[in-house]
């Protein structure tokens, strides 16, 4: 864990939501995987971890050979402000690596009111907000979930929309 992160945790409410290390968290050797996926939920840890679809997809993606899927949640306002003040980019709970260093940033979006949180997470991560500003060196930004039946409001911010039930979707987009 980053020393800067250790310094700010005592100043926020519910710091345990930002440190990972739970039972059944999937850890892999990042030098032995081909693709790293930051699986992001645009709400707090407690809301995201109670989402059955997120838990299922986390397991499905981690069962793909050569893929390590890590979790990331939107920080609460106090933590977001502390992270911005300390220049700590949004990170994954398993490795604490910044999600901007991943190959894919995948959002699970269940409702339209989460769209602003998704954009805020990209900003906090240091990822160019608009898909047109990204290069081959930045992660592919993917969004799925029930809100993707109307993905037009966030079309400028994502590279790929996955429409349909993620649990039943083929893993082909990740394997590409």
What does each of the following model-derived ranges do?
Residues 1-14, 64:
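Helix-enriched interaction subdomains in cytosolic or periplasmic regions
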Residues 1-7, 45, 139-141:
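N-proximal accessory regions
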Residues 3, 21-26, 59:
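ER/secretory pathway lumenal C-terminal domains and tails of membrane proteins involved
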Residues 16-19:
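Sequence-level detector for compositionally biased, low-complexity segments
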Residues 22-32, 95-97:
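Short boundary motifs at domain starts and secondary-structure transition points
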Residues 37, 42, 48-59, 63, ...:
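Low-complexity, highly charged intrinsically disordered N-terminal segments
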Residues 44-47, 112-114:
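Short acidic, S/G/P-rich loop/turn micro-motifs used as interaction or catalytic elements
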Residues 74-176:
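Glycine-rich beta-alpha loop elements in corrinoid/cobalamin-binding modules
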């Amino acid at each position: 864990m980053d020393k800067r992160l250790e310094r700010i945790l005592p100043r926020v409410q519910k710091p345990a939501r930002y440190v990972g290390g739970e039972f059944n968290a999937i850890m892999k050797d990042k030098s032995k995987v081909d693709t790293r996926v930051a699986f992001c939920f645009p709400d707090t840890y407690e809301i995201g971890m109670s989402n059955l679809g997120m838990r299922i997809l986390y397991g499905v993606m981690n069962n793909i050979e050569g893929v390590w899927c890590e979790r990331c949640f939107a920080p609460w306002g106090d933590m977001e402000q502390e992270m911005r003040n300390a220049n700590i980019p949004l990170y994954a709970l398993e490795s604490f690596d910044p999600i901007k260093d991943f190959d894919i940033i995948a959002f699970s979006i269940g409702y339209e009111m989460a769209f602003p949180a998704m954009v805020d997470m990209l900003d906090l991560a240091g990822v160019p907000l608009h898909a047109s500003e990204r290069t081959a060196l930045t992660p592919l930004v993917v969004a799925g979930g029930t809100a993707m039946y109307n993905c037009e409001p966030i079309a400028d911010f994502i590279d790929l929309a996955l429409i349909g039930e993620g649990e039943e979707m083929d893993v082909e987009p990740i394997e590409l």
